[in-house]
């Protein structure tokens, strides 16, 4: 899975995807590493197109030109936000591909292996970077859809804040994310020790 991240120095693109994410919180001050998405929506159209173009080049090498693409799009979009998605989907580098827009909750359900046609009802929860989407799907239709502006990034920051408050230790959000994932494994009842490195 490729991260939707981009690293830039001024107007020059340094890295895209996982390579850019590896630089997150490690790059010098003159290199900016961020995501073109914010709260589940496209925040920077130009950077999103660059990220997509980079990913498409990798996919074309594996699957060949002319593959089918599906865009998972949110339901609660404004006219301007819809225009951004359509502009990205109709970019010139995608013209050789078949591109379909799919409602994000439906795409989530398919990815989880939910049988949409023979389904009495399923609740789908998608925790994104800055938002969480709750959906109830039955008979292939979305009955309820609700989004809140809290996601994984806020959880990471909360973990960092708790470590700082309790142990007077400053850690980065990537370390906070790793701790969050360990603590979130509810099925694992074994206590596990974790070494955390930070700044006192």
PLM regions with names:
Residues 130:
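Conserved Rossmann-like nucleotide-cofactor binding loop
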Residues 1-127, 135-200:
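Nucleotide/phosphate-binding catalytic cleft detector across ATP-hydrolyzing
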């Amino acid at each position: 899975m490729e991260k939707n991240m981009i690293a830039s120095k001024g107007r020059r693109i340094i890295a895209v995807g996982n390579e850019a994410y590896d630089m997150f919180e490690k790059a010098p001050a003159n290199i900016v590493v961020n995501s073109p998405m914010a709260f589940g929506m496209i925040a920077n159209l130009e950077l999103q197109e660059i990220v997509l173009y980079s990913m498409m080049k990798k996919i074309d090498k594996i699957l060949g030109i002319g593959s089918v693409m599906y865009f998972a799009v949110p339901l609660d979009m404004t006219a301007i936000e819809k225009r951004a998605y359509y502009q990205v989907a109709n970019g010139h580098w995608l013209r050789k591909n078949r591109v379909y827009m799919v409602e994000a909750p439906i795409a989530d359900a398919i990815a989880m292996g939910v049988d949409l046609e023979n389904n009495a009802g399923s609740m789908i929860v998608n925790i994104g970077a800055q938002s969480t989407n709750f959906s109830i799907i039955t008979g292939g239709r979305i009955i309820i859809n609700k989004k809140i502006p809290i996601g994984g990034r806020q959880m990471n920051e909360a973990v960092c804040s708790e470590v700082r408050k309790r142990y007077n230790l400053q850690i980065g959000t990537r370390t906070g994310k790793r701790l969050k994932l360990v603590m979130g494994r509810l099925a694992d009842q074994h206590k596990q020790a974790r070494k955390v490195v930070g700044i006192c």
